[in-house]
Amino acid sequence: MAEELYTSGQYLEENPAWHTYESPWKIAHILPMLKKHKLEPRTVCEVGCGAGEVLRLLQGHLDADTTLWGYDISPQAFEMCKERANERLHFKLADFRREQDTPFFDLLMVLDVIEHVEDYFSFLRDLKSRSQYKLFLIPLEISVQGVLRGKIFIQNRNRYGHLHHFTKETALRSVEDLGYTVLDYAYAPEYEMESKVWQTNLMKLPRRICFACNQDLAVRILGGCRILILAQ
């Protein structure tokens, strides 16, 4: 079962920081999307919140009365969340889909989660009625460069548990096919983040230059990007 990767402690061994270093970058893309659509959520939930760092950072940009909840199935991630909890930031070790007593949230965030879920169609279908707005962050791993390298898909499967791979078009279509209305989307280029991987750093300049010229073409050919989708 895919869930064992996250509940057994194996994922923490492979990723001891649980991607907290990516959280400021994610916030830098989430906030402009909320501002653009004049969204000021008073209740926020993140499904698959990991260490809870995104919620902790987001809380500092929202109204002081905003209530935030984070759910994750990993006991190890939940332990990391505990040190970030406060009066209005709560975390729960649970599968959000099986929770029946949750409120209807203003905003539900699913950030870098869909690619990990065995049946992401049922997963997305179960979330649709749980909030007014949704934010999905999905890695776009299918690119010419990725296909030519070949091994990247298996490497991401082994280390990160990525079971599914997307292009911009398949990510948007997957959301739409399940009855969501896509209100907006934006690319989130990974070259903005620091990296200790030399191959990633080598690709930063060409990705940045190509992205400035033609975003769609750059992502299709060179990859290294995610898509942030706002939906209802």
PLM features: what roles do these ranges have?
Residues M1-F104, L111, F121-D126, N158-Y160, ...:
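Conserved N-terminal segment of class I S-adenosyl-L-methionine
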Residues E14, L137-H162:
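Short, glycine-/aromatic-enriched active-site segment of Class I SAM-dependent methyltransferases
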Residues M109-H116:
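Short catalytic micro-motifs in class I SAM-dependent methyltransferases
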Residues V117-E118, S131:
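Helix-to-beta-strand junctions that scaffold the AdoMet/dcAdoMet cofactor pocket
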Residues D126-R130, L137:
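Conserved helix-to-beta-strand junction in the class I
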Residues L230-Q232:
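Short beta-strand-to-coil "C-cap" segments at the C-terminal boundary of structured domains/repeats
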